[in-house]
Each structure stands twice: as structure tokens, then as C-alpha cells.
Amino acid sequence: MKRRTVLIGALAAPALLQVRPVAAQAQAPAPLAQAPGFHRFRIGGFTATTLHDGSGTRPVQGFVRNAPLEDVQRVLAESFLPTDTLRIPFTATLVETPRGLTLFDTGNGPQQAANAPVGRLMANMAAAGLDPARVTTVVISHFHGDHIGGLITAEGAAAFPHAEIVVPAAEWAWWTDPANESRSPEGQRATFANTARRFAPETRAMLLTLAS
């Protein structure tokens, strides 16, 4: 915050305190509708757009496994964050290049509930004036659900029908091997099933793996 802004705020404070309670109560409540979740900026000669897919919540207990719960809660409290729940935002990035649009990760994908807290990437693409049919490359960083979930539509079709899908070879080899699934912890097995769903024959035909 700039010094000038702080000074103006300090000078205005006495005047704000003189506002009658009736006037304060008459103010309209803040709207509940979410503003379009995208932000556009430049990377050298390219235009990039971050696309908000929503956010999820997770309990703090058990989420961080390499530190005691008390230490995690202390750090959260020092950062003025809740100590019982973590809010995790999901954002994908799209870059406009002379060859077309390149999308990095695809969000959680379509959700059944209309008020679901995630799965908003397509709506925010539309709000930003970006057409999924113009995406020529989709780069997947890894195979967690919030990265590959948006590869297909609610009907099971390819969400980006003209795109080549680029994935790390190591990720592809691990999550498509049934032997790995059988010896993985229970908590990881959903990712194997989700990988099979997202990389159905239609999207698998668009696949290009890269060496790690």
C-alpha cells in the first residue's frame, strides 16, 4: 500500500465514524455472484491468461504429512489463515502463440452440481473470449485430478477437439500400468481410474508423450 493511500485513509477515518447507523444499514449487501475468474497479462511477445477453475477445502489435519500438526497450525495462524481448514485454489494458464492457443493443465472438469466450487474453467474461458476449439496444444504437468479432469466434457467428448495433448512420459507410464495400481496405497488408486476415464480412446488418439 502506498504512503499516500495510507494518509488518505487516516484522514478519512474521522469522517467515516460520523456516518449515522441508519445510513450504514441502508447500504446494499455485497453481491454473491462471482466475477469472471480470469486475468490476462503479457509474457514477452505472448499474451497469457490465467483461468480460475474454483477452489476446494481440505482439513488441515492429515494434509501436511512431513510436519507435526501443531507446527502446521502455528504457521497458518502466523499467516492469518484458518488453522482447521485449507482453501486450495485451482488455476490453469493459457498462452496465445502464433501457432494457436496452448493450455497448461485443464482443471477439475465438469461437475454434476450446478453450484459446485470447482469445474469453472470452461465458463471462465468463455468470459475471457477464448474458444476451446482454438486450443492447439494442451500441456499436462502431472495426472492429479485437478490437472486432467477437464480433458473431457460431461458427455465424454474431447473438451479441446483440435488439440494435441502433451504429457510427461514418466507420468503416463506410471498411471497406465495396472501393476502399479495393485501395489499403490488405497488413496492413490482413484488416480488410476481417473486417468483411464480422461484418456479415453478419443483423447488418447491426440496424445503425445514427452521424456521427463
For each of these PLM feature ranges, what is it?
Residues 19-49:
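C-terminal segment of N-terminal export signals and the immediately downstream linker at the start
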Residues 92, 116-166:
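Active-site metal-binding motif and surrounding structural segment of the metallo-beta-lactamase
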Residues 49-51, 139, 166, 208:
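Hydrophobic/aromatic beta-strand patches that form the interior of the parallel beta-sheet core
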Residues 5-26:
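N-terminal export signals
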Residues 37-128:
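Conserved beta-strand hairpin/beta-sheet module of binuclear metal-dependent hydrolase folds
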Residues 126-130, 134, 161-164, 169-212:
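Metallo-beta-lactamase
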Residues 107-109, 144, 171:
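Catalytic metal-binding/acid-base residues of hydrolase active sites
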Residues 61, 114-115, 150-152, 177-178:
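Short, solvent-exposed loop/turn and secondary-structure capping segments
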